[in-house]
Amino acid sequence: MIKNDIKNLACWFGGVFLFICCLGLLVEPQRAGKKMAEASQSIASSQSTEGEETRTEATARSSKTMEEKQEVMEQDLPTMEALGLSYDYANMTLPQVVQTYMDDMGIDPSQISFSYKDLTSGQTYAMNDTQSMTAGSTYKLPLNMLVVDEVAAGKLSLEERFDITNTSYEYKGEHDNYVAAFNGAMSIPDMQEYSLVYSENTPAYALAERLGGMDKAYSMFGRYGRSKAKVKTISRENKTTTDYYIQVLEYLWNNQEKYKDILYFIGVSFPGEYYKRYLYDLTIYQKPGYVREALNVDAIVMEEKPYIVALYTAYLGGSTEASEEISGVGIDQVGQIAYIINEWHRVNMN
């Protein structure tokens, strides 16, 4: 009896052991498969993130649902329709929306260059960002930053007034007016204000003299970034790329306290024009640049989630290298593109 009980018990344990072994054989492949799937997902996620960080037309990294995007679209629809700028912002990338507008306006793809970066997520978009564009007066922003660096290093004083009677100039009449208005000498804060708020040339040349002249100043622009294009910063021929300038804006953003005076001046510059033309009740720090065929603007836009944008254009409104006046059509189109970029940001990123 006891022998039979032991035998039965041994058989029972053997059956249980065999069942566990079989179960293990079934479960282990599932675990292995799950680990392989997780590894594949991790690799795919890593590749996706890497792609998004480059300036491509990748899908925006936005946590907003389609319902949330449509809600903003409906809220902003009256303004969109009034401006004639109703586009499918929620279902298009930023370059796609801008390209659609350009197609509607008959603007050639080569006429627009921009770089955009959302400062919260790091999402970037660009169009023709390595294409050489005429910089206009946008060089005056990094020029002012260089002078602030010298002041911070104790090499220049904000109180001292510097002689401007022999300063280089582009227009003699403007130069003579400044000499008369400031009794032949300007302080650095005066130079900053008039070169940034009003984008005047004489105070910009006076700032450059504090650094050793324009050639020396231009050679230092690489402090704030370098483009992957042939033109690395801003050339002495007044050419640049948005790939470079977006780095200048990010450097400015990351050092706001140091450059607070610059931010103030570009914050009050050109009210109702350039990036501010159709964007009301919104704080915008902008440095426009106009010369001949070029109408440009570089901006830090204080939306709910701030972003930076470098927008450069050529030949808008029929302007040419021989143009001496700003094209009314061209300046309006710059404002419309600014609205489109901002609306896309509101819908997808805010």
Language-model features, listed with the residues they occupy:
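Structured C-terminal helix/loop/strand segments within mature extracytoplasmic catalytic/sensor domains
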Residues: 2-106, 124, 209, 215, ...
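Charged, often glycine-rich, active-site loop that binds/positions anionic groups
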Residues: 127-131, 170-182
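Short, conserved catalytic-motif segment at the N-terminal edge
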Residues: 103, 108-132
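Structural recognition of the beta-strand scaffold that forms the well-ordered cores
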Residues: 113-116, 136, 194, 228-230, ...
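Active-site-proximal beta-strand/loop segments in catalytic clefts of secreted hydrolases
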Residues: 117-119, 167, 195-199, 207-210, ...
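A conserved catalytic-loop motif detector
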Residues: 238-290
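Active-site SXXK
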Residues: 122, 134-164, 309
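Active-site-adjacent helix/loop patches that line small-molecule binding or acyl-intermediate pockets
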Residues: 78, 82-94, 166-167, 180-258
